[in-house]
């Protein structure tokens, strides 16, 4: 379920001339029975609302006085969000003959045609106040108070997000709160300016329009209107225009060879989610996202992330969380992910958050023989990004839930064919030329027959591969370096650069020079560590026939120490160094 909160205006929306129909009341009860929270967002003061509509327990929270006061109906707790109106201002309105003045805990209200006197009084007194119109009503508030700020404070109190909120209104003062809602609607009697700014204009007016919206929400969580919303996020550009990431979308698979741009695209997705305040949880087996700006990073090479700490961090709607698994051995990662996935499913069922789940190196979490309990992997697994090298490294039950296949790298056709072979799906042949740096193929299995080729937008944040991963992390066996020697008598595995240096210190000269002269070190540094400079250093050492084993070890290990080990907490000795 995407929408957990229903926010509605009162006068002119829920009610008609202050009266809420029995049909509207029944619809609100049905909505509450679905587990959703209902928030009333009104310009009225609490006493006025209670006198007009005593059934306030239909709502979980009330935003009153146009955002100045919030009220928890279950506890009766009222929170005033600003200072009271200046007495000098109220006195001046009375002195100038303004009629129908109502003074609340934050708001001063009157009616037209006194708006000009109100504006003149604010100017003449030199006050910083905001005038808000609600059809015939004229409301004066502190400059930082409106229906949007009140709604956002209520959502914070409930631990929920505007991105899981549907809003409906009819008048000028509804613009602010409808703008922050993920989905906005206007009743048929709404002002033209409001109708022009919302996602859906209802066919019916007042309470009947609210009932119409509730019925549609209960029918399919408004997913039939997904393509009509204006809040999709741009992640690239094609010849046909921008390429969009729908904020409530189908599972996406990003695949391609190492170094082909998977992490760059994933970083851009995390980037745009952050910029638009969509919460994500990124599971990072290899430490590629340890330094993502603004995210809470839990776990690392020396400590596994604790599940309770992860979930506590995610309870805050504004917190993005990276779960770094470099401190968990590769065989133990699927079990950890099973426990994490169960907790994430529960949080999503309760709040709709985290909005997105990004799984880097997904084959570490869900290997091909992975068999989770059926309830942990729902058929409608939404807002998930899976990142891997080869599609066939993931279990079929996961691949069958993928709706969008995104491919990077020069071997895109082979990668897409591998997806087809694994899923028994007929996949298209990608036309030439091969992809260049920054280009992406995307195939939508549901909506598009022909894949689209686009340029992925670069991240506005600098994302660097965290070097501690290679210094201290646990590389997979197939990515580790093996000292075997000229006769294959050894099989010493270095799954990170610290171990590489430690083994190098104790290895015999013949074995060291054997791998050096064959450029085995250079290939590992370039293809696995993704460090061209370190690879070049090893190649230069290999080309110098007069360089002894001791000196070449000293040079290469010193280069590793300069660029990697100093970033970690571990120490190593450098052969030949004092």
Where does each model-flagged region fall?
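Active-site phosphate-binding/coordination module
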Residues: 17-103
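P-loop NTPase catalytic phosphate-binding loop
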Residues: 229-356, 367-377, 382-385, 392-393, ...
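Mg2+-dependent phosphoryl-transfer enzymes with acidic/Ser/Thr/Gly-rich catalytic loops
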Residues: 1-3, 21, 141, 148-229
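Terminal, compositionally biased segments used for targeting/anchoring and flexible tails
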Residues: 431-578
